[in-house]
């Protein structure tokens, strides 16, 4: 894989000269091979190594380069026609491939080629962009969007209309990451490379970017770009220094462990935020 990485890095340094008509056979194949690794889950844009998330920037660069080597082409889903550079992940799947993959793909769900969808994943009518990784047992509910190169852990629930930000537009340095066993409530948005750590519960309508204040009401601590493990987060506001106004913030109302989550349930956790 090191040779492939080197070729992608060199191509990236010369990306301004790459187009569908000028790209060499070797570089084009390297980009395709990198996307195949992402599509199969053999490689991913980010992975946790020794407790820390490591971003493989060369794979993100391969995703970006793929847009330079392809022309738009007509494609269809049997009902509608589309015109795009990126083929759909499941367009050529056979029934046997679906069985082996172990996922459920509901009509009108869309996943782009170069994304990975694990076993026991359920894709309701939703969108999974190129380079994304959706791990085993995750539910991507109706109208949820998993952005380019986003990393979604095992047994995550992305509720209806959730948006998980990508890295391509606008260009971001690091992907947005949702770790294992997280719950993201309906219409919430997590973007700009924010990391939601394992077991966190995000209520409905919470918006978190790198600049969003994430206030822990128990400790008074303010986090940026990271939701701590086991945090239960709701939308709220914090006052300005002069008290003249308040600005939006995400509020950590409590922290729970996995055992408590399993015993109590998500809805009970969110209903009881003022009980303590």
Swiss-Prot record:
GO cellular component, one term: cytoplasm
Metabolic or biological pathway: Amino-acid biosynthesis; L-lysine biosynthesis via DAP pathway; LL-2,6-diaminopimelate from (S)-tetrahydrodipicolinate (succinylase route): step 1/3
Family matches, as Pfam families: Hexapep_2, THDPS_N_2
GO molecular function: 2,3,4,5-tetrahydropyridine-2,6-dicarboxylate N-succinyltransferase activity; nucleotidyltransferase activity
Domain of life per record: Bacteria
Entry keyword set: Acyltransferase, Amino-acid biosynthesis, Cytoplasm, Diaminopimelate biosynthesis, Lysine biosynthesis, Repeat, Transferase
SUPFAM superfamilies the record matches: Trimeric LpxA-like enzymes
GO terms of biological process kind: diaminopimelate biosynthetic process; lysine biosynthetic process via diaminopimelate
InterPro entries on file: DapD_Trfase_Hexpep_rpt_fam (IPR005664), Hexapep (IPR001451), Hexapep_transf_CS (IPR018357), THP_succinylTrfase_dom1 (IPR023180), THP_succinylTrfase_N_sf (IPR037133), Trimer_LpxA-like_sf (IPR011004)
Catalytic activity of the protein: (S)-2,3,4,5-tetrahydrodipicolinate + succinyl-CoA + H2O = (S)-2-succinylamino-6-oxoheptanedioate + CoA
Chief subcellular location: cytoplasm
Compartment(s) where it occurs, according to its Swiss-Prot or TrEMBL record: Cytoplasm
Residues reported to bind substrate: 104, 141
The protein's Enzyme Commission number: 2.3.1.117
Binding partners and assembly: Homotrimer.
PANTHER family to which the protein is assigned, alphabetical: 2,3,4,5-TETRAHYDROPYRIDINE-2,6-DICARBOXYLATE N-SUCCINYLTRANSFERASE, MOLYBDENUM COFACTOR GUANYLYLTRANSFERASE
Family, similarity comment: Belongs to the transferase hexapeptide repeat family.
UniProt-recorded name of the protein: 2,3,4,5-tetrahydropyridine-2,6-dicarboxylate N-succinyltransferase
Organism field: Pseudoalteromonas translucida (strain TAC 125)
Encoding gene, per UniProt annotation: dapD
């Amino acid at each position: 894989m090191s040779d492939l990485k080197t070729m992608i890095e060199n191509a990236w340094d010369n990306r301004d000269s790459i187009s569908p008509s000028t790209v060499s056979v070797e570089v084009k194949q390297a980009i395709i091979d990198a996307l195949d690794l992402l599509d199969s889950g053999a490689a991913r844009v980010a992975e946790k190594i020794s407790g820390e998330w490591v971003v493989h920037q060369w794979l993100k660069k391969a995703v970006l380069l793929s847009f330079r080597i392809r022309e738009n082409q007509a494609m269809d889903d049997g009902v509608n026609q589309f015109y795009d550079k990126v083929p759909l992940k499941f367009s050529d799947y056979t029934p046997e491939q679906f069985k082996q993959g172990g996922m459920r793909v509901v009509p009108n769900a869309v996943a782009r080629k170069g994304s990975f969808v694990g076993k026991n994943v359920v894709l309701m009518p939703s969108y999974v962009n190129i380079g994304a990784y959706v791990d085993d047992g995750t539910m991507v509910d109706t109208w949820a969007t998993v952005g380019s190169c986003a990393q979604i852990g095992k047994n995550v629930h992305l509720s209806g209309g959730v948006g998980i930000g990508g890295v391509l537009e606008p260009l971001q340095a690091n992907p947005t990451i949702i770790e294992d066993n997280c719950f993201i409530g309906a219409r919430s948005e997590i973007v700009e490379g924010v990391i939601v750590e394992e077991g966190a519960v995000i209520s409905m309508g919470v918006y978190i970017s790198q600049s969003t204040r994430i206030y822990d009401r128990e400790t008074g601590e303010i986090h940026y770009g990271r939701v701590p493990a086991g945090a239960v987060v709701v939308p709220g506001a914090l006052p300005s220094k002069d008290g003249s106004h308040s600005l939006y913030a995400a509020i950590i109302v409590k922290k729970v462990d996995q055992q408590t989550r399993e015993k109590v349930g998500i809805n009970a956790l969110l209903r009881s935020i003022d009980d303590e």
